């Protein structure tokens, strides 16, 4: 495919030095997926492109691309900065992990569809001060389908029951009702309200998830469960997740 100028709307989420005065920046876009951009001269003093490619800058960018490999950033039209993320290390760590999680689920230039909307949702909510932990857990639950391990949350994986008391089984790939608790050794032994949280954040569309109020105890339990689901089904070992976990210890 011949190289062409293309206008994309997206969010810069990772950058590193490239050669003496240039940067490599990763941008997540809805239609064109994740793209690695060469940003010429971005390391030079007073470079306008440097400011427009700070992490978590969202806007419209004009790129020179062939649809594969490295593309070049030519200019930008309108860019929004999420200042709250620069002032708060914890918020920044949460958002960095979320974008890293999305990045590892797709190859470059693969359209993201609903997962782009999920990234925007997380960025805006965490920047606005909504519970970072719960927003991250929402993203983690919804990203399981992108990794090919979508859990069954709508009904019991054994009998199909949709209402009642439920627990979660990683081995069976979803929720099980109380009728089968005594025969499923692999269940996580979550409290009913904790399983209900996993079901709610996994099933409800993001636009229907309003103000999230969950106790610290429940958040710790659901975080532990989600981390175990990822560890036993995907095992990503992301540096951003390790940093986030270390940050929570302080």
From Swiss-Prot:
Short name of one Pfam family: RecO_N
Transmembrane regions listed in the UniProt entry: none
Origin: domain of life: Bacteria
DNA repair listed as a keyword: yes
Keyword DNA repair: yes
Gene field: recO
Keywords attached to this entry: DNA damage, DNA recombination, DNA repair
NCBIfam families on file: reco
Role according to the record: Involved in DNA repair and RecF pathway recombination.
Similarity comment text for this entry: Belongs to the RecO family.
GO biological process: DNA recombination; double-strand break repair
HAMAP family hit by this protein: RecO
InterPro entries: ARFGAP/RecO, DNA_rep/recomb_RecO_N, NA-bd_OB-fold, RecO, RecO_C
UniProt-recorded name of the protein: DNA repair protein RecO
Organism: Lactobacillus acidophilus (strain ATCC 700396 / NCK56 / N2 / NCFM)
Taxonomic classification: Bacteria, Bacillati, Bacillota, Bacilli, Lactobacillales
Signal peptide (UniProt feature, chain positions): none
GO cellular component: bacterial nucleoid
């Amino acid at each position: 495919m011949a190289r062409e100028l293309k206008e994309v709307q997206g969010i810069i989420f990772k950058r590193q030095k490239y050669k003496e005065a240039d940067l490599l920046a990763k941008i997540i876009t809805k239609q064109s997926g994740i793209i690695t951009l060469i940003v010429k001269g971005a390391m030079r003093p007073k470079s306008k492109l440097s400011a427009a490619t700070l992490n978590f800058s969202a806007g419209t960018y004009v790129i020179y691309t062939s649809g594969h490999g490295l593309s070049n950033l030519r200019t930008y039209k309108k860019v929004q900065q999420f200042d709250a993320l620069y002032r708060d290390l914890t918020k920044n760590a949460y958002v960095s992990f979320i974008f890293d999680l999305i990045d590892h689920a797709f190859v470059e230039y693969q359209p993201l569809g609903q997962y782009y909307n999920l990234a925007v949702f997380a960025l805006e909510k965490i920047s606005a001060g909504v519970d970072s932990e719960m927003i991250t857990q929402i993203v983690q639950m919804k990203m399981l389908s992108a990794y090919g391990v979508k859990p069954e949350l709508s009904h019991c994986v054994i009998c199909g029951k949709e209402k009642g008391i439920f627990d979660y089984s990683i081995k069976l790939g979803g929720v099980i009702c109380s009728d089968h608790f005594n025969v499923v050794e692999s269940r996580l032994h979550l409290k009913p309200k904790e399983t209900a949280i996993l079901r709610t954040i996994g099933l409800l569309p993001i636009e229907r998830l309003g103000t999230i109020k969950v106790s610290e105890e429940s958040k710790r339990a659901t975080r532990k469960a989600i981390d175990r689901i990822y560890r036993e089904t995907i095992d990503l070992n992301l540096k951003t997740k390790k940093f986030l976990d270390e940050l929570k210890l302080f």
